[in-house]
Every structure is written in C-alpha cells, then in structure tokens.
Amino acid sequence: MTHPELLRLRDSIDNIDAALIHMLAERFKCTQAVGEYKASHDLPPADPSREAAQIARLRELAEKAKLDPDFAEKFLNFIVKEVIRHHEAIAKAGRT
C-alpha cells in the first residue's frame, strides 16, 4: 500500500539532503582554499575567535529558523573539526 503524502514528504527530504551535500561540498572547497592560504602564510589551522563568532551567528540563525540552536552548534562543531583536520593536513603537506 502506498501513501502518496508520505512519499511526497520523503521526496522533499531526499531533495533537501542532496542540496545539503552539494552545499557542504562547496563549503569544503572554500575551506580548502582557506587552508592553503593559512599554510602558505604560516597561520595556525584553527582560529578560535572566528569559530566562536561562527557558532554565535549560527545559533542566532537557527533560532530565527525555529531550529534547535544546540543542534546547530553541534553540527557546526562537527564541520569545524573536520575543516581543522584538513587544514592541519594541508600545513603538514606544505612542510614536507
């Protein structure tokens, strides 16, 4: 038995998931360039003040969008950790 409304909702979720993946890929292209810039200018991979500002900004955006700000912060922290890991790898590759 099919449920057309459920299928429609799931199609919407699938489309949003695809958009999220594409947006994350674009974000990582930008952070890759940031990592290369930092490595070439001897800057540290992490920038705690920038990260704190980003978290505050994302929490505010989440509240306005009626999304749990704690969830948004956890999501951004996960992304930031991965970005820092990439930046560290870029810096290490530049030193070898």
Regions found by a protein language model. Give the residues of each.
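Domain-level signature for soluble enzymes in the chorismate/prephenate branch of the shikimate pathway
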Residues: 1-96
